[in-house]
C-alpha cells in the first residue's frame, strides 16, 4: 500500500499521524525512501516505504468506524488474565496488531481495572500509551480537538464502568433499571 503526502495514517504502537513528506535517505550507505510522519506532540517518525505495509501502517478509520469504536467503550470488560505478566503480553500483542478495536478494548479494560484495584506502573504506562493511540486516531478520523475526544472517551468509559459495576452487584439476572433502583434505593 502506498501513501501520499497529506494522508492520515496509523503506525502501530505509535498512533495516528499525517504523512508530511516522502524523502530518500541514506542509511548504512543504502538509499531508501521514507515516509516522514508527523505524530501528535510535534514528533516525527520515519518509516521505510518498502516496509510500511509489513509493519502494519494503514489508513485511519472513517467517521462511521470511529463511532463504532466509541460504542465499544460502553461495553463491559472482556476477559483478561489474572496474571499481570500474561495480561501485559496479551495487551502488547493487541497493540502491535494496529487494530483500533483491540486498542479501545485495552483502554476500557485497564481503566476498569484501575478503578477496581489500581494498576502497576507498567500497566499505567500501557494504559496511557493505548489511550494516546486511540485518541490520536479518533481525533484525525473525526476532525475533532484532542481534548474533546479525550473527554468523550473518558465519559463513555466512566458511564460503562458505573453501569456494568452496578449490574455485576445485582444478584439477579434482571438488570433492568427498575430492578437496579430497587437494589440500591431503600423502599419506603
Where are these regions (language model features)?
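Charge/polar-rich, low-complexity and marginally structured segments
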Residues: 50, 55-188
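A positional/architectural concept
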Residues: 1-57
Amino acid at each position: 500500500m502506498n501513501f501520499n503526502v497529506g494522508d492520515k495514517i496509523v503506525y502501530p504502537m505509535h498512533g495516528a499521524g499525517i504523512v508530511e513528506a516522502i524523502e530518500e535517505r541514506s542509511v548504512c550507505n543504502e538509499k531508501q525512501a521514507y515516509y516522514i510522519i508527523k505524530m501528535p506532540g510535534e514528533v516525527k517518525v520515519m518509516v521505510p516505504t518498502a516496509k510500511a505495509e509489513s509493519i502494519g501502517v494503514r489508513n485511519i478509520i472513517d467517521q462511521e468506524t470511529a463511532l463504532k469504536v466509541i460504542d465499544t467503550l460502553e461495553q463491559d470488560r472482556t476477559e483478561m488474565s489474572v496474571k499481570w505478566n500474561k495480561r501485559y503480553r496479551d495487551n502488547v500483542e493487541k497493540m502491535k496488531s494496529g487494530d483500533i478495536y483491540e486498542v479501545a478494548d485495552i483502554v476500557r479494560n485497564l481503566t476498569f481495572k484501575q478503578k477496581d484495584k489500581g494498576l502497576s506502573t507498567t500497566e499505567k504506562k500501557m494504559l496511557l500509551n493505548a489511550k494516546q493511540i486511540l485518541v490520536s486516531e479518533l481525533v484525525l478520523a473525526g476532525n475533532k480537538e484532542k481534548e474533546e475526544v479525550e473527554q468523550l472517551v473518558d465519559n463513555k468509559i466512566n458511564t460503562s464502568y458505573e453501569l456494568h459495576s452496578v449490574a455485576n452487584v445485582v444478584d439477579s439476572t434482571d438488570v433492568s433499571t427498575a430492578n437496579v433502583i430497587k437494589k440500591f434505593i431503600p423502599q419506603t
